[in-house]
Amino acid sequence: MTQPAILVLEDGTVFEGESVGANGLSVGEVVFNTAMTGYQEVLTDPSYARQMVTLTYPHIGNTGFTDQDDEARKIWAAGLIVRDVPRRPSNWRSQVALPEWLQARGVVAISGIDTRKLTRLLRQKGAQNGALMAGDIDVEKALEAARKFPGLKGMDLAKVVSTESTYNWKEGSLDLNSDSFLGLGALNIGKSAHASAGSGEELAFKVVAYDYGVKLNILRMLAERGCDVTVVPARTPVAEVLALQPDGVFLSNGPGDPEPCDYAIDAIKELIAQKVPTFGICLGHQLLALAAGAKTLKMTTGHHGANHPVQDLDGGRVMITSQNHGFAVDESTLPANVRVTHRSLFDGTNQGIALTDAPAFSFQGHPEASPGPRDVGPLFDRFVDLMAARA
């Protein structure tokens, strides 16, 4: 027997449907994602912490879930909003259906609502705070909860979703033929620069990755390029990172507002001063810009999808990218030593920067995809090239 569920927005709009997840009450910022596939990767992306994800594609759950496609060890999204959930998933890799997967992880979710109407409302008014309630329904209680939610502006969530302890990562991408993950340096890119003299062996690049909410596929793409990755908590002092003598430092994706992350901004300033090769993605991109002296701004609806066109301003190439962010770098505030490398063809917002006086660059979207295209994957190779040039 199905349980009732409601979505209540801060403006008083109420959507009634049925529960396809856990019972209870959850609050957060309601956003929409336009990707047709990859719902598991979306839900397990830590960048969605304190956000409720509306998936605009009508049928969600067709291919079920498999543990191999998780992008984090925990679900940080505040809830899921969909139009329809197929009764029976069909895929040779599927281990469990959507409702069972959500219930096991305690995620509140609603189906059977008009997601087109909701998406148009969010597009017109901007991201809304909302409350999802499943099981025992109380509209007034849900509305009160939605209006009490403070919103993401000014909210530092990187320290919330970050790992609590340092760990090492050497696992590459998934090989479906062998049903296993590739090992360190599987792509054999750029490692010759680190061949030990006379040994005939190629050594991996030592990369320290600041975890602000890192996706696992980012770590895999670094590993298969010959990077021996040490993942550290978001608030790790930069002195501890430099003591590891890394060839490069990676700044991960993550949720929330970048401006309150003073600990990260201060650390990145020192990395810039020390000329350490540095590569940032998503939140890491915004933090690099802040460390360089720029400012960020809250977007009306943000970018959430897997089909966003971005232009590489250096070569003129247009790439289709995966995007997931609600804040953006304000190009008008970039200092003279920072040049723009990429720009969105949807709304003209900044998508990439590079410092002219330090080996540091960043990209707003997700070159690791998961889900989405890998048109921007060569940025990982650029990071390897920076480290090789410094060796």
UniProtKB/Swiss-Prot annotation:
Top-level lineage group: Bacteria
Active site: 282 (nucleophile), 366, 368
Positions of L-glutamine binding: 47, 254, 256, 283, 286, 324, 326-327
Keywords, comma-separated and alphabetical: Amino-acid biosynthesis, Arginine biosynthesis, ATP-binding, Glutamine amidotransferase, Ligase, Nucleotide-binding, Pyrimidine biosynthesis
SUPFAM superfamilies, A to Z: Carbamoyl phosphate synthetase, small subunit N-terminal domain, Class I glutamine amidotransferase-like
Catalytic activity: hydrogencarbonate + L-glutamine + 2 ATP + H2O = carbamoyl phosphate + L-glutamate + 2 ADP + phosphate + 2 H(+)
Matches recorded under PANTHER family: CARBAMOYL-PHOSPHATE SYNTHASE SMALL CHAIN (PTHR43418:SF7), MULTIFUNCTIONAL TRYPTOPHAN BIOSYNTHESIS PROTEIN-RELATED (PTHR43418)
Entry protein name: Carbamoyl phosphate synthase small chain
Species of provenance: Xanthomonas axonopodis pv. citri (strain 306)
